[in-house]
Amino acid sequence: MVDDGSTDGSSAVCADMAVADPRFRLLRQENAGVSAARNAALTLAGGKYLQFVDGDDRIHPQATETLVHAAEAMGADLVLSHFYRVDGERQAVRGHIKGERLLTRQEFAREMVKAPANYYYGVLWNKLYRRSIVESRGLRFEREVAWGEDFLFNLEYIRSVRLVAAVPRPLYYYIKRPGSLVSTQATLRRTIEMKRTTFDYYKDLYQDLDLYDEQKAKVYRYLISTACLLYTSD
């Protein structure tokens, strides 16, 4: 657990948990942003797998058990699940790959490009990663990237996976909060810049997988969505 300069009582709660259960480790640091906090956690992490949880969301009590079981039973390097999107009193299941499936890296890439901007693929918190892959590739989060650093991390991680397991069960509660990333012109500009950067990562990934010629039209669909976002904001 990383306390990234919190100002409420959450640090004390985490400290009590760390005392009560040695599996929990607490790191306190001055506020440096989400990427710095995640990188600090990766440096301290041990064990076989990595799982991320945002501080103001919730996970299903059986989330970790379910994801680890899928990884072990299927020999997967990446496991991802459906999730709940919670907006006030409303709760909806979100996901993309249907049913329980085991996919090769190329098969997964073909599924991902069908919905390249989908949270299901871009976020960290509905996934389980092998720590050995993260460390062998030296993967860390880009501190200078203001938004979408998790998507870039995922696109880099996928390069090294052999098999991907999809679990259709929703195991995470993503709490929708007031406000929008594109509510101001400044954040809109950052969003567009991030989408352009993500497009470059996408293009490089599909070229490395020898899928670019096959999937070129779908890859460029992501870039076109960026142009549409800019046009509709004028």
Spans of features found by a protein language model:
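Conserved small/polar residues in nucleotide/adenosyl-binding loops
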Residues: Y231-D234
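Short, conserved active-site loop motifs that form the nucleotide-linked donor/cofactor pocket
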Residues: F24
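Donor-binding/catalytic cores of nucleotide-activated saccharide
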Residues: V34, G55-A165, Y172-R190
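Short aromatic/hydrophobic "clamp" motif used to bind/position activated sugar donors
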Residues: L50
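A conserved acidic beta->alpha catalytic loop
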Residues: D3-A12
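Amphipathic alpha-helical repeat scaffolds of TPR domains
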Residues: Y220-C228
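Active-site acidic Asp-centered loop
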Residues: D4, V53-G55
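Glycine-rich, basic loop-to-helix element that forms the pyrophosphate-binding segment
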Residues: Q29-A45
